[in-house]
Amino acid sequence: MDKKENAVLTVVGKNEIGILAGVATAVAEANGSVVQVSQIVMEDFFTMNMLIDVTDLNGTIHELETSIKEKLPRVEVHLMHDNIFSAMHSI
């Protein structure tokens, strides 16, 4: 069995309709799968962390990040492989 690969997505910005839907659409179009989502809306501010299964992704993680940014140009989007995320937080 192949090892599952995950990526960690962070989205921050002014709250508006369709942020979660835009991200989920981009992930599905790239053949990714949403594993877990945590989001908080504080007044006008939106924050979301998402764990995405990218094992069978069509394209690269960078291409998925670009697709999300194109769908949601008014929010900050950061996507990184969980190996990088784990390494950053284990030092």
Language-model features and meaning:
Residues M1-I91:
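A conserved regulatory-domain signal marking ACT and ACT-like small-molecule sensing domains
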